[in-house]
Amino acid sequence: MASSKAFGWAAKDASGHLSPFHFTRRQNEADDVTLKILYCGVCHSDLHTVKNDWGFTTYPVVPGHEIAGIVTKVGSNVTKFKEGDRVGVGVIVDSCQECECCQQDLESYCPKPVFTYNSPYKGTRTQGGYSDFVVVHQRFVLQFPDNLPLDAGAPLLCAGITVYSPMKYYGMTEPGKHLGVAGLGGLGHVAIKFGKAFGLKVTVISSSPNKESEAIDVLGADSFLLSSDPEKMKAATGTMDYIIDTISAVHSLVSLLGLLKLNGKLVTVGLPSKPLQLPIFPLVAGRKLIGGSNFGGLKETQEMLDFCGKHNIAANIELIKMDEINTAIERLSKADVKYRFVIDVANSLSSSNM
């Protein structure tokens, strides 16, 4: 297969340290869209992958699956996009397109996904958005609404859809209902914004008292519940209709279940490193539901982007240069970011030190 020279930053071993890296991309074919990458969000998955925390990283690896940019070339069969379009690429760049999941526009649940980076694909391996350009099948390219900024919109392609999809699927959108958002990070801060746009009462549940002002005054939550205060947790028993749990650290589910009303729903989207204990009694006694969710399919992700454009929803970001990525990864490991790092790829990659 013909290829084109590309440039980005890659991790070359499990130290997770990223450095400049020359590699090749496949050339644009009939169904492909080539985009110049302007911005790329920094996701927790990037951190886990560069350090091989999940045990399946193949080095060298260029991370990044929150990609926003401009179309520079389209293949002869491409009808949805044209040069100059503002577009994005999320977590996957291909799927089998034949299974039941793919036929239902749920490519994120396909048993044979091709991830945007670190996946075998057509005799090579995919590389992500910490780079100058990418070539993607048109089915896996998303259109940005004109009023949605590319830099603050990029994290929506993973963090945004990861909370939007379960809120829609599990019916956590009824105006006037009470939503608890457990954890205030990259996922949680977007969940607050979606909740308010759906007309919900939103309470942030966090063990960090210093996050109260940020949750209410900056992000627009209605209230704050300090989960490390037993008395406040007891007082909030049975007050919430839904909880979306974005916490990635090991934590108690029983305390969250106690906050739910009869028929309440707890949906987990965080990925703790160790299994959580599942308490059955409160599920049975309160006819409560606990569920999970992956990121959404392409149709739903486009719906989410359009929703964000309509309601002026974007991530709160800290824009960084490409050569600041190692510091950003270290800070991310300590949850030291409000609330998503985004790399200013187009304005900093070419000037990165070799």
Curated annotation (Swiss-Prot):
Note describing how the cofactor binds: Binds 2 Zn(2+) ions per subunit.
PROSITE patterns hit by this protein: ADH_ZINC (PS00059)
Binding residue positions for Zn(2+) 1: 43, 65, 158
Gene: CAD1
Alphabetical UniProt keywords: Metal-binding, NAD, Oxidoreductase, Zinc
Name by which UniProt lists this protein: Probable mannitol dehydrogenase 1
Function summary: Oxidizes mannitol to mannose. Provides the initial step by which translocated mannitol is committed to central metabolism and, by regulating mannitol pool size, is important in regulating salt tolerance at the cellular level.
Gene Ontology MF terms in the entry: mannitol dehydrogenase activity; zinc ion binding
Keyword match Oxidoreductase: yes
Keyword DNA damage recorded: no
